[in-house]
Regions:
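Short strand-loop junctions, especially beta-strand C-caps/beta-turns
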Residues: 34-35, 239, 380, 435, ...
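Non-catalytic terminal extensions of PLP-dependent enzymes
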Residues: 124, 132, 136-150, 157-374, ...
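Conserved phosphate/anionic-ligand binding catalytic regions in large, soluble enzymes, centered on
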Residues: 90-103, 107-108, 152-156, 237, ...
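Active-site-proximal cap/loop segments of hydrolase catalytic domains
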Residues: 575-577
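Conserved PLP-enzyme active-site core in the AAT-like
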Residues: 1-128, 190, 203, 207, ...
């Protein structure tokens, strides 16, 4: 992963021994693993001090569970800590999904990439949570953003959070002790048989000098997998569910490898972590991690939080460019099967035949649907898919001796991830103008393709466009780029309007990514996990992402874009089932219904809300942009006020001010029945009437939205009634949703960034 990310920027990677390296002052950063891959627990205090003396920042790739026993990276001087949260309560799932983490010091918090949830205050002065520092993110800063991240694995992070809530610091300490003491017991036994360990100090992993082939044969006979880094070494890890019987079996295997009979071993009961590296500071000290210790308590805590969210279980979520469709129960069921949950991503191929059949069939299905020759499931999000696709194009040009091609054309209407991903791939971004109807300005594109023909890498294009229309000249656009020597990357964010009717291959693109969490029915999970596979034409097949451990990808594949060879493999049965259950005709029908639903809503709302862009036929694709640009002048109400007021009607806000300022982007998907769309339409029409009635009044029902139950029940000084605030239409009473907080002060939250201990 480091090699993949660093190479486009020309960053030199130096792999060396931490205790032998001397900093020169040319370095900008260093990364160490804690514990190391071979299990070694090392004291990096002197290394970090030497780095800081030369102005170098240090990152620790740290195992979270180990930190229940080991001194925290911050204590020995690290500036940043990163890693996986998977082992805190989420299954391996043949590689994922799992949430990563990144932590840093106070001084660097405003340079953090990705989503940050911070504390602010609402209109009534109550503490409220919100996404903080959005100005640094890709949807605003585009190629100047701190990352291309759009998806955050919020669902997996929540699962890890609940695991920590339930177990608390004492539970994590108990789990860490179990893993460590099992490793220590095996270490003593192996050393007694004259095996040599790679590291004297360890947490839960041992690397042993042994004849790998002999040990592997014996281990497989006993149903155990080890990892074999070389022909002369064996590596094993233990965890909180390792049993005494399994410890004894491991010892017997190594005894048999030496032709011996295992002797009884006394279990180790005291920590072997060096005193200088033992943790002495508190963790998980907040009340929430020390309160819920029964399943009933935890269930009620989770339910309390769930009731504060508007989800698809409440009403339609009209977020444009997000495709919030039904996640059918039948598709979700396989996720609970142990065979999918418990498979290790590096398990021998003959132990993963079911997974491999599923992966192969799904790759073939997605390639067929997109009109391409091959597919990689490795990217873990749409943004990661964009990056992977661009890196494949880059590798293709390099293979032809044209590595100097580094210009990417991107329409002004494109989602911010496009230029952010291009920047991460080391590309120079040239923006292509759009015309008054929201289409790509073809003449401007042709002019820029010609101007940069000697260095053109490609074009990033979305179809239908981010403006929600099918561009009639899309093939002409593709041909112009090809004629200039470039490749065409198609953003698959809007594939829900293509499947079964057309495809990127037919249009002429060379590569596309898909959002399985949009078009192909995986849950969004409050932001993730996502899966963003790429599909490519035949001439790009050889460059699909490879992996350093498991054979996958093309013969000349780019280096890995994710830690797991097939990305978040445990989620793949969802999309596999979606495709198999619908079949070709069903997939086409879903696309048709998505387009019909969007056009129905656009037409129904037309008397009150103009659709900002439409195609040559006067129709939209699968989503529409509602024009609210005059509301501020006419009513002193902006699109954010209307989005907030929709919450009082029981609806999640649409996409706000994207891709056009002061607009709402609405995408109903094929999943919504007419009755639900009609309720949403009625709500928007009713809000328009409220805006008209409120014109010129600062204290009005729209500007003050949303209204909480506490506010409704408290002292009332507004010129409108409580009933008008809480129950604006009769059907709202049937299943009223009260937001937990009212309108949040975004500026306050950014000026006073606080993410923890913010009481």
């Amino acid at each position: 992963m480091l090699l993949t990310r660093s190479e486009p920027f020309g960053i030199e990677l130096i792999v060396d021994e931490y205790d032998e390296y001397s900093f020169t002052g040319k370095e900008f950063g260093a990364i160490v693993q804690y514990p190391a891959a071979n299990g070694a627990v090392r004291d990096y205090t002197d290394f970090t001090a030497a780095a800081h003396a030369k102005g170098v920042l240090v990152t620790a790739a740290a195992d979270l569970l180990s930190l229940a026993l080991l001194k925290s990276p911050g204590e020995w001087g690290a500036d940043i800590a990163v890693g996986s949260t998977q082992r805190l309560g989420t299954p391996m799932g043949f590689g994922g999904p799992g949430a990563g983490y990144m932590a840093t010091r106070e001084a660097y918090k405003r340079n953090m990439p990705g989503r940050i949830i911070g504390v602010s205050v609402d209109r009534l002065g109550n503490k409220a949570l919100r996404m903080a520092l959005q100005m640094r993110e890709q949807h605003i800063k585009r190629e100047r953003a701190t990352s291309n991240i759009c998806t955050a694995s919020a669902l997996m992070a929540s699962m890890v959070g609940f695991y920590c809530v339930y177990n608390g610091p004492e539970g994590l300490k108990r789990a860490a002790d179990t893993a460590h003491l099992a490793a220590a017991t095996v270490a003593d036994a192996l050393q007694a048989m004259d095996y040599k360990l790679a590291a004297a100090d360890f947490f839960d992993t041992l690397e042993v000098s042994a004849e790998a082939a002999v040990v592997q044969s014996l281990a497989l006979e006993n149903g155990i997998n080890f990892y074999y880094p070389t022909e002369g070494s064996v590596r094993m890890s233990f965890d909180e569910v390792t049993t005494p019987e399994e410890v004894a079996e491991v010892i017997r295997i190594f005894a048999a490898a030496k032709g011996r009979k295992a002797k009884a071993v006394k279990p180790v009961t005291e920590s072997r972590v060096p005193a200088a590296l033992r943790r002495r500071t508190a963790y998980l000290s907040e009340a929430v991690f020390n309160t819920y210790r029964s399943e009933s308590d935890l269930m009620r805590y989770i339910k309390k939080l769930e009731l504060r969210d508007i989800s698809l279980a409440n009403s339609m979520i009209s977020l444009g460019s997000c495709t919030m469709k039904l996640n059918a129960a039948a598709l979700m069921q396989p996720l609970s099967l142990a065979g999918f949950q418990m498979m290790h991503p590096f398990a021998p191929a003959d132990q993963a035949e079911g997974y491999m059949q599923l992966i192969t069939e799904l790759e073939n299905d997605l390639a067929t649907i997109t009109g391409f020759a091959a597919c990689s499931l490795q990217p873990n999000s749409g943004a990661a898919g964009e990056y992977a696709g661009l890196m494949v194009i880059r590798a293709y040009h390099q293979s032809r001796g044209q590595g100097y091609r580094n210009v990417v054309l991107i329409p002004a209407s494109a989602h911010g991830t496009n230029p952010a991903s291009a920047a991460m791939a080391g590309m120079k971004i040239v923006t292509v103008a759009c015309d008054d109807k929201g289409n790509i300005d073809v003449e401007d594109l042709k002019a820029k393709a010609g101007e940069y023909s000697s260095e053109l890498c490609g074009l990033m294009v979305t179809y239908p466009s981010t403006h929600g229309v099918f561009e009639s000249r899309i093939r002409e656009i593709v041909d112009a780029v090809h004629d200039a020597g470039g490749q065409v990357y198609m953003d698959g964010a809007n594939m829900n309007a293509q499947v079964g009717l057309t495809n990127p291959g037919y249009i002429g693109a060379d590569v596309c990514h898909l959002n399985l969490h949009k078009t192909f029915a995986m849950p969004h999970g409050g932001g993730g996990p996502g899966v963003g596979p790429i599909c490519v034409a035949e001439h790009l097949r050889a460059f699909l992402p490879s992996h350093p451990v498991m054979p996958t990808g093309g013969d000349e594949g780019i280096t890995a874009v994710a830690s797991a060879p097939w990305g978040s493999a445990m989620l793949l049965p969802i999309t596999y089932g979606y495709i198999k259950m619908l079949g070709g005709n069903g997939l086409r029908r879903t696309t048709e219904m998505a387009i019909v639903n969007a056009n129905y809503m656009s037409s129904a709302l037309a008397p009150e809300y103009r659709t900002y862009y439409s195609g040559e036929t006067g129709r939209v694709g699968h989503e529409m942009i509602l024009d609210l640009t005059s509301f501020k002048k006419d009513y002193n109400i902006d699109c954010g006020d209307i989005a907030h007021r929709l919450m009082d009607y029981g609806f999640h806000a649409p996409t706000l001010s994207f891709p056009v300022h002061e607009t709402l982007m609405v995408e109903p998907t094929e999943s919504e029945p007419k009755a639900e769309m009609d309720r949403f339409i009625e709500a928007l029409v009713s809000i328009k009437r409220e805006c008209e009635a409120a014109a010129g009044q600062a204290d009005n029902v729209v500007a003050n939205a949303p209204h909480t139950a506490v506010e409704i029940a408290g002292e009332w000084t507004h010129p409108y009634t409580r009933a008008e605030a809480a129950f604006p239409l009769a059907w709202v009473r049937e299943a009223k949703f009260f937001p937990y907080v009212t309108k949040i002060d975004n500026g306050y939250g950014d000026r006073n960034l606080c993410c923890r201990n913010c009481e």
